């Protein structure tokens, strides 16, 4: 029987810092606490890495991240991520599911991307905006470079810190935790006209599967009519939605991930109330515990492997993996390792690198898990 978290309360910055340091100190063999930068008011943007080899990228092991509290008054994600840290630490080595997850995945958890906004927000805020923005009063989820619109707000320190973090690690999968509705929102988040229509990414099928992997473990979310009292007409079949079809978000973080890194990110709305009372928090953990774990497991779906040099057998960095008919190549990391999320099907996959002859393989992906596909390239 897995041990459940007990620390259910709202953690202000100093409490969160104490919590993170405590778990980093108590579980040094599976944790590493680091910061990716500072907020406007110079609070650390902490990340807890949970892995069986903290601080090290293991060749072939995918990297995963959760980001919470990007909007400072949307606090459920922040607390769930602290619960998740506690849960993973306390169950590693005893619970087989947690042990397997931590041994096979390098997990990075950022409980708060907007610690300044959080300090301004108020417990009991249902649908307000106080504390949503950062200290310079900019919305961080409208602050990333956008494919369709020129973002005119100056780039914020929190945004820049996260962008450089995303360029530092080979993240494969991510979720950005928000509040104010109950749905998993997937790319694209906007479209050329800036109107509410379905804006399909090349990996629409993958994103739908990822979104469903979360929503179907959350009974209330999966039912699809989340906030009857606040938004009576809102209906999301199976608790998922294309971002732009719901409403336009130019400058959002999830699309930037997909368009500028190898990482697939979705945005998860965890509940209709943005800052619920502390006594509600155990209920949110209960509703989302399975979803949070199932979503991490999705990082192992699709294909993964190595692109190697035929002469010396070394990994080739920055080789390109492209899948026929899906316009979204991914690149290899320093050991020549790559991960490409895909749904069930048959694919033609090509590995190419500068100065080498490309190699194409036909690959069968089943519904269960990941298939290892290695490529050996010869110099031209």
UniProtKB/Swiss-Prot annotation:
Question: Pfam families, per this entry?
Answer: CarboxypepD_reg, Peptidase_M14
Q: What is its EC number?
A: 3.4.17.22
**What are its cofactors?**
Zn(2+)
Cite the residue spans of the region called Disordered: 112-137
Q: Name one GO biological process term.
A: peptide metabolic process
Record: residues binding Zn(2+): 71, 74, 178
**Keyword tags:** Carboxypeptidase, Disulfide bond, Glycoprotein, Hydrolase, Metal-binding, Metalloprotease, Protease, Zinc
Tell me which residues make up the Peptidase M14 domain. Answer: 9-299
Cofactor mode of binding and number, as noted: Binds 2 Zn(2+) ions per subunit.
- Reaction equation(s) it catalyzes: Releases C-terminal Arg and Lys from polypeptides
- The record's disulfide annotation reads 227-272
Family note: Belongs to the peptidase M14 family.
> What name does UniProt use for this protein?
Carboxypeptidase D
Q: Which organism is it from?
A: Lophonetta specularioides
Species lineage? Eukaryota, Metazoa, Chordata, Craniata, Vertebrata
What gene name does this entry carry?
CPD
